[in-house]
Amino acid sequence: MQQKHKYIKMEKLIATFEDYSIFKADAKCINELSQFIVVENYKHHVGTVEASQLADDIADVTKEELELYGDNTYIYIARNNQGKMLGSIRVFLWNRQSELPLEKIYGINPLEAIHSDVKFNYWHVGRFAIDSTSGISTFTLFKRLMALAVQPIVGDSDSYMIAEIDSKLLKVMNALGFVTNQLGDSIYYLTSETVPISSSKQGIMGFYSKYGCLCGVA
């Protein structure tokens, strides 16, 4: 096992499967993470893009992720046995001070749109991407990454998930058991129609109770 994953520097092994492993990473992976997310979004939704546009988007995502990163940030990445990134997702506990993507893109503040009561915590889930050409089951990997991302929300007594979700992916999430609330109109962001949503801890449990076991987190 040590030999297989010797290339990993600041990543903690979470689970190993036949074709890939999932790691918990830290801020040192944000540059690689941002490039992966932007490239995969363009591959999936557009196909081709100018190099300058790609570079600008990667820089924007990197800057935003570094600004939002904190002690309660969890980054999960999947790598194949050669170390190539195959998938990613990130969740963080909002400190009520940093500007959320939800605010920046949609002008929506969770304290106004959901609850202002200080007892509620808001966890932002984002930066989900999967390499659809990897040959693995992307659907299974999605469920594994999402189960890991919502784990801290499920473990928090009064909590909400907030996110900006691709409209097609949102339909999949709802079919898998999420109960979501749309917070505003969709906007075209990073190559796809994106919907601002929230989900309470109870709304997450329909998914988590079924699929949390995929990574041994439930």
Regions found by a protein language model. Name each.
Residues 2-7, 68-72, 92-97, 205-218:
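Intrinsically disordered, low-complexity, positively biased terminal segments
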Residues 93-95, 132, 169, 203:
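Feature marks short, surface-exposed loop/turn motifs that line or immediately flank catalytic pockets
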